[in-house]
């Protein structure tokens, strides 16, 4: 017989299952403890947004580090743009961001149902696909082309913060 060995992929798989099924209040407590110990304490004005966003932040997360990384865009006041990603913001992407912001100003309630028609309209008018709209918006809102779904990002940030981030000078 061979000796037993530590299988990290199996442990991470079990941890992912545990994170998906755990009570979100308990998960939030664990996340705040983790951040306080290993990262930086979550600011009190951001805690409510993080707590409400755990439903989607924990998707595909295998560790508390993954949840922290997925929610980093909520925790920061100023976005640090990934330089490789900011290069993707060309003139067409700037137009998409500007057009989205114009239409976004007109909506009162943030939900997938109110955001989807705006995105679909931008896809048509800019003769592009979802990536052509979603990617520039994700970069503008989070500083990276990777992250949660675009509707989740917008809803979690709230109208005021989204407008502030979409009008960032770097994107002009």
Role assignments for model-derived ranges:
Residues 113-172:
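Charged substrate- and nucleic-acid-binding regions of tRNA-handling and nucleotidyl-transfer enzymes
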Residues 20-24, 65-66, 143-150:
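Short helix-capping/linker segments at secondary-structure and domain boundaries
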Residues 8-12, 25, 51, 55, ...:
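Non-catalytic, well-ordered alpha-helical scaffold segments
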């Amino acid at each position: 017989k061979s000796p037993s060995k530590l299988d990290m992929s199996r442990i991470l798989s079990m941890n992912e299952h545990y994170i998906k099924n755990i009570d979100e209040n308990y998960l939030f407590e664990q996340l705040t403890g983790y951040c306080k110990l290993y990262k930086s304490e979550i600011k009190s004005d951001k805690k409510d947004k993080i707590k409400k966003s755990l439903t989607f932040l924990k998707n595909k997360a295998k560790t508390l580090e993954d949840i922290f990384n997925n929610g980093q865009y909520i925790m920061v006041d100023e976005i640090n743009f990934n330089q490789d990603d900011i290069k993707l913001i060309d003139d067409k992407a700037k137009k998409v961001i500007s057009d989205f912001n114009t239409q976004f100003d007109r909506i009162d309630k943030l939900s997938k149902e109110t955001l989807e028609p705006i995105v679909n309209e931008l896809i048509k008018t800019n003769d592009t696909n979802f990536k052509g709209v979603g990617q520039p918006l994700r970069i503008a809102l989070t500083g990276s082309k990777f992250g949660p779904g675009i509707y989740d990002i917008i809803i979690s940030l709230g109208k005021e913060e989204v407008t502030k981030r979409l009008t960032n000078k770097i994107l002009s």
